[in-house]
């Protein structure tokens, strides 16, 4: 009799609409229960039985129940699942398979089966890519996944690399394809094979894409020619190789090996500016005045060169610092190194006075054995030879930015707008509390930004600098010329790494159009989106592999008294993140390790400080001694403890 009763239906509808609901993200805990986080201030308890319907990270709508002053959430509707495509480790065998996602907060095995047409018999410990097919909030009985790709077996020494590349859906090897002959581009190439060009790189580098030649001019000025490898002389726009490079966007540099953007035959041989081999290049000739200013007579042209020496960073630095036993092979090469060091000094001073110079941070290099084991991690400080190349490249990129802006009005530009205007007042207020007075309007201009950066660099510690970092906007890739506040420059367009950056290949083609006096087509904005996304994925992949290798490297230090100097890089409610100075590893120090009495401890992300009994005990940028308490291999996390 109650079937199709309109009154009953109306009552149900009314009850439904009156029941309080909330949308938020599920946060799991290790104890079975969870929370529905609605915003930074509000969260609701999810009891263990209800947690079985959801997964950590799911965005859901839940019904809110109130019983005896306590509110709890009952998941009702899935807005966006946390897991769609993921990597994990297979459990079980044959017909009864499950997969545990490789994520620190997802511990439960998800029943699964191999997709049709996947010819691999999965067994315990295998790594796989899976896609979620069922979810309890979609009306399914349980979670269920489908294995779509076999990655590798559990004991493979190279798991960190293969799993990370599969996780981010990145290529594992160099692209296929060969370039048989140079294109006829209608360019007249200047023959510079007689000049003493040199390359300066790491000893192991094969893809040399820049060579330098310097000359002293009679009036105290210096001339610099930057010659850059010319892959667009081999790769036609729109060709198969070009399309592959466009998708990859960058060479992916991971600890231990790289996955090139171009076929290795091109990147490491045909285009690489090897010593004593004649190579086509795109070149830029510039004149530097005595104070390091780049004069207006910038000239881009096509040429052929023959590098006369493959020099190595450390050897060149040693020689310039009068240490070590390496000597340039001839007086001509020695003269080049001396002139390039002069150029470096002039340009460094010019940038210090008129733009911005980054603080030198060491690069960390993993030294790996045959089986991917970490033999050592060495900090490689940026020395004079690194700076020679850096100054030459920055100068060349400034030249390209100017020429493309003035002749075409577009190109592939690296743009950084400094501070987000919405944050200007908060920034000024924060600086004021530390005794620095800035105008909220002025700090949004290039000059105002540079002025502030110089004041911050003059501070005794980097603490204040670290506090304002959150107010900065991100660097972007744009087809429109614009300033790069981070470098303190009006415009910056890179063209010096075309073997490893697709944007630089585009700028090569545009510069060639300028050289030939032809009209050029503005690059489409989609390409900048693809490049930004690939750059993000490559950085995440590099970080993920690094985390894995750091965990392997420090595993045997866990629980020992070995001390490490560590810089505090971030403070949150739960504790502090630190970077080990000698090797670059990131470790976490939980709040209870800082002070046993929780009520006497205040960890403030806002202030970048840890206070104990009202006194500041730690702050971001402090360097402290730590020991390694624990290394959790399954999550690749390192837990440290301050030395008392």
From Swiss-Prot:
Its EC number is 3.1.13.1. PROSITE patterns: RIBONUCLEASE_II. Keywords: Cytoplasm, Exonuclease, Hydrolase, Nuclease, RNA-binding. One of its GO terms (molecular function) is exoribonuclease II activity. Signal peptide: none annotated. GO terms for cellular component: cytosol. The keyword Hydrolase applies. GO terms for biological process: mRNA catabolic process. It is found in: Cytoplasm. Residues 561-643 form the S1 motif domain. SUPFAM superfamilies: Nucleic acid-binding proteins (SSF50249). Belongs to the RNR ribonuclease family. RNase II subfamily. PANTHER family: EXORIBONUCLEASE 2 (PTHR23355:SF37), RIBONUCLEASE (PTHR23355). Involved in mRNA degradation. Hydrolyzes single-stranded polyribonucleotides processively in the 3' to 5' direction. This is Exoribonuclease 2. The lineage of its organism: Bacteria, Pseudomonadati, Pseudomonadota, Gammaproteobacteria, Enterobacterales.
């Amino acid at each position: 009799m109650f079937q199709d009763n309109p009154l009953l239906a109306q009552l149900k509808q009314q009850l439904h609409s009156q029941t309080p609901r909330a949308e938020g993200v599920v946060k799991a805990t290790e104890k079975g229960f969870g929370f529905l986080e609605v915003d930074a201030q509000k969260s609701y308890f999810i009891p263990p039985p209800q947690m079985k319907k959801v997964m950590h990270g799911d965005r859901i709508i839940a019904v809110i129940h109130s019983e005896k002053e306590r509110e709890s959430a009952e998941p009702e509707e899935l807005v966006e699942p946390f897991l769609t495509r993921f990597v994990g480790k297979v459990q079980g065998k044959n017909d009864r398979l499950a997969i545990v996602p490789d994520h620190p907060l997802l511990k439960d095995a998800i029943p699964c089966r191999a997709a049709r047409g996947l010819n691999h018999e999965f067994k315990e410990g295998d790594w796989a890519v899976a896609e979620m097919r069922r979810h309890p909030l979609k009306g399914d009985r349980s979670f269920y996944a489908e294995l779509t790709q076999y990655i590798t077996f559990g004991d493979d020494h190279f798991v960190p690399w293969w799993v990370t590349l599969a996780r981010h859906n990145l290529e594992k090897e160099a692209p296929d394809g060969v370039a048989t002959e140079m294109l006829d581009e209608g360019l007249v190439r200047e023959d510079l094979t007689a000049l003493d060009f040199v390359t300066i790189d790491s000893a192991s580098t094969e893809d040399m894409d820049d060579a330098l030649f310097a000359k002293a001019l009679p009036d105290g000025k210096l001339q610099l020619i930057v010659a850059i490898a010319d892959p667009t002389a081999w790769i036609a726009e729109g060709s198969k190789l070009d399309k592959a490079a466009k998708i990859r966007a960058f060479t992916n540099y991971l600890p231990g090996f790289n996955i090139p953007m171009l076929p290795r035959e091109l990147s490491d041989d045909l285009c690489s500016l090897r010593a004593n081999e004649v190579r086509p290049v795109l070149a830029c000739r510039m004149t530097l005045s005595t104070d390091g200013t780049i004069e207006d007579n910038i000239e881009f042209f096509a040429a052929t060169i023959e590098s006369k020496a493959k020099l190595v960073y450390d050897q060149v630095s040693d020689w310039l610092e009068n240490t070590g036993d390496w000597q340039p092979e001839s007086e001509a090469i020695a003269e080049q190194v001396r002139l390039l060091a002069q150029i470096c000094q002039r340009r460094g001073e010019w940038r210090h006075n008129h733009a911005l110079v980054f603080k030198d941070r060491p690069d960390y290099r993993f030294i790996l054995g045959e089986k991917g084991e970490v033999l050592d991690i060495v900090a490689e400080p940026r020395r004079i030879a690194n700076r020679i190349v850096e100054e030459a490249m920055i100068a060349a990129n400034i030249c390209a930015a100017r020429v493309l802006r003035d002749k075409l009005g577009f190109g592939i530009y690296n743009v950084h707008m400094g501070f987000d205007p919405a944050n200007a007042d908060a920034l000024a207020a924060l600086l004021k509390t530390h005794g620095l007075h800035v105008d909220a309007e002025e700090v949004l201009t290039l000059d105002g930004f540079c002025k502030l950066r110089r004041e911050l660099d003059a501070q005794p510690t980097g603490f204040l600098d670290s506090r304002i970092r959150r107010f900065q906007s991100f660097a972007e890739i744009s087809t429109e010329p614009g300033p790069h506040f981070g470098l303190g420059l009006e415009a910056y367009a890179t063209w010096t790494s075309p073997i490893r950056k697709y944007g630089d290949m585009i700028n090569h083609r545009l510069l060639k159009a300028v050289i030939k006096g032809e009209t050029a087509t503005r690059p489409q904005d989609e390409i900048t989106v693809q490049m930004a996304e690939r750059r993000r994925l490559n950085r995440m992949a590099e970080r993920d592999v690094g985390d894995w290798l750091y965990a392997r490297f420090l595993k045997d230090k866990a629980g020992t008294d070995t001390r490490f100097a560590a810089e505090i890089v971030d403070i949150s409610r739960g504790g502090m993140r630190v970077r080990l100075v000698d090797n670059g590893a990131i470790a976490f120090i939980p709040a209870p390790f800082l002070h046993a009495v929780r009520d006497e401890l205040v960890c403030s992300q806002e202030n970048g400080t840890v206070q104990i009994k009202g006194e500041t005990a730690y702050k971001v940028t402090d360097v402290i001694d730590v020991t390694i308490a624990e290394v959790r291999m399954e999550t690749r996390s390192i837990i440290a403890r301050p030395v008392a």
